[in-house]
A protein has these predicted regions:
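Well-ordered, non-membrane alpha-helical segments in soluble/globular domains
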Residues: 1, 22-29, 85-89, 112-114, ...
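Divalent metal-coordination and catalytic microenvironments
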Residues: 12, 43, 69, 96, ...
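Catalytic pocket-lining loop regions of alpha/beta-barrel enzymes
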Residues: 34-37, 83-208
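Active-site gating/metal-coordination segments in enzymes
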Residues: 10, 18-104, 173-176
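Generic structural signal for hydrophobic
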Residues: 3-7, 58-61, 69, 96, ...
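Mid-to-C-terminal alpha-helical segments outside catalytic/metal-binding sites
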Residues: 1-11, 97, 197, 201-207, ...
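Short catalytic/ligand-binding loop motif for oxyanion handling, primarily in non-cytosolic enzymes
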Residues: 21-22, 76-79, 138, 158-161, ...
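Active-site beta-loop-alpha junctions enriched in small/polar residues
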Residues: 17-18, 46-50, 71-75, 106-110, ...
């Protein structure tokens, strides 16, 4: 929150993490964050640890507290081996659809068919996909499912031929800053090569994200470089697409009641 005004942040997604036995504490913490941020943080509840009955009750008694469900990380230990179209998750999406909630997920590798099946069965739910595992199949998914969206963030910043984002392959702030500044043009040109055509095929469903990881990735010096890169990349998109990708798509999806394309 301290950097919101300094970095001119209009809004962001915040994940609300809890467990069923501590539901009351989870809701109180979420209410506090929403109030302290003056609504700039759109809260997503991680739904996989709650029963369907609890999710329905939360929405009944706390309408408007959460803008979506997620992040559901299918690549991560707790969900590893589960599929986005397992019945457990289809039940969650049904609650999301009833309450106009976005569903954000980070699928594991080769789960595009499972994601597509979930999107097909829930056409009234907006699915915000995140993560490099869906980078190759995302266009085909968007072609087939108008309710699929995608956020791009650190995976834009790569040094060829590495598949990993520089923000995650760097060991510390100093290493990141040195590598970033020495290879800025290489990083930017690769990002344009990888993403420009895709974004312009579906200009209303891609959005710029700011996902980070270790504590040092939130350092002000790092933030300045990420902002510089984001602006430089956006400037390489067609003028009619730039604002959409930068913030309009995200605001329409999340900040304005989940209205989509």
């Amino acid at each position: 929150l301290c950097n919101f005004d300094k970095e001119k942040v209009r809004g962001t997604i915040g994940f609300s993490i809890g467990i069923e036995p501590l539901l009351e504490e989870t809701l109180k913490a979420a209410e506090s964050v929403k109030m302290d941020s003056s609504g700039k943080i759109s809260l997503f509840l991680m739904p996989q640890v709650f029963s369907t009955e609890s999710l329905e009750s939360i929405e009944t008694t706390n309408k408007g507290l959460f803008a979506g469900y997620g992040e559901i990380a299918f690549y991560f230990v707790a969900q590893k081996g589960q599929n986005p179209d397992d019945q457990k998750y289809l039940d969650i999406y049904e609650v999301a659809g009833k309450n106009n909630l976005v569903v954000m997920m980070h699928p594991d590798a080769r789960q595009e068919n499972s994601v597509g099946n979930a999107a097909r069965k829930n056409p009234n739910v907006k699915f915000l996909i995140h993560g490099p595992e869906m980078e190759d199949p995302i266009i085909n998914m968007m072609n087939n499912h108008p309710n699929v969206y995608y956020s791009i963030d650190a995976i834009l910043i790569r040094i060829p031929p590495s598949p990993g984002g520089l923000l995650y392959t760097s060991n510390n702030k100093e290493e990141f800053i040195l590598t970033f500044t020495e290879n800025f043009d290489v990083l930017l040109n690769r990002a344009v090569k990888d993403w420009k055509e895709k974004i312009e095929q579906h200009p209303d469903r891609f959005m710029w994200g700011t996902d980070r990881a270790h504590k040092w990735t939130y350092d002000e010096e790092v933030s300045v470089l990420l902002e510089e890169f984001g602006r430089a990349f956006i400037a390489r998109l067609e003028p009619a697409v730039q604002k959409k990708f930068a913030y309009e798509n995200a605001e329409r999806l999340i900040g304005m009641g989940g209205e989509g394309e």
